[in-house]
Amino acid sequence: WNVYRLPTLQKLLNEFGIVPTYLLTYPVVRDPHAVGILREIFAAGECEVGTHCHPWNTPPYEEPLNAYNSMLCNLPVTLQFEKLQRLHEAIQSNFETAPVAFRSGRWGFDAEVARNIIRLGYRIDTSVTPYTSWAQASGPDFSRFSPRPSMFTEHLRAERDSNHMLAEIPATIGYLHGDFQACAELVGRLRRAPFCGFKLGSLLSRLHLLRKVWLSPEMETPAIMMQLVRQMRSQGYELLNLVFHSSALLGGCGPFVRSQADEHAFMRKLHT
């Protein structure tokens, strides 16, 4: 299982003094061997543990299995909370600490999910993907969000410098050229009539003139990621949130790393 490769990853992260947050699903915390690996790293103070909830593999199993219900934000609020609570308690039992960081599976996050995790004592969410909409997958639209950390207000609208209780640390996503917000607005205009039929946004992206980039070794080369980092710094962004799935640690476990050669290439990306 890919989680069994975590010691190799952790050794690399330790070389750079990086303390990662491992966001755990219900199947992981029900696997004694996986928990043993994680507890050893956690006990050494080398990582934090948080919560990553996929509805389809987190009890109670009451909803029909379909694409719509794979987004946590689409479930009834009570069922959302029950799943979150079960996963939260399983992590707390295994690690003797209450997790405070959360990411919704498939980025399925909204105000109701935020309220539910606040009820459970979470202080950090990292479910927002700036300049990205999941509407075609029955998910949320984050196209108006920036990668800048913010605090949710009591009405759960992201506003920076508020003193309310849930911090949003978005995945680091931005553009390689120009002001991020201006690029996002231009992309939005190009997707509407009369421009949408010409697919200008896709053309400009391929030419790297309007390219959106994730800070993720699953999706980008080290050179492209470093270009994004430089853009972030030049625009005053002070925090980076690099993301990837643990399935990338084992060839054949996911769509991004399909072979042992891909696996070795992925680790080289991280080292670079």
Which ranges hold each PLM region?
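Active-site beta->alpha N-cap acidic-glycine motif
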Residues: 1-44
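Generic structural signal for well-ordered alpha-helices
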Residues: 6-10, 35-39, 81-88, 114, ...
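CE4/NodB-like, metal-dependent polysaccharide N-deacetylase domain
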Residues: 10-15, 19, 76-106, 161
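Hydrophobic faces of well-ordered beta-strands that scaffold small-molecule active sites
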Residues: 20-22, 49-53, 100-104, 124-126, ...
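Short glycine-enriched loops at secondary-structure junctions
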Residues: 53-59, 245-247
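Surface-exposed, active-site-proximal loop segments in enzymatic domains
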Residues: 60-74, 252-258
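Active-site-adjacent pocket scaffolds in enzyme catalytic domains
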Residues: 104-233
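Active-site and substrate-binding clefts of carbohydrate-active enzymes
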Residues: 208-272
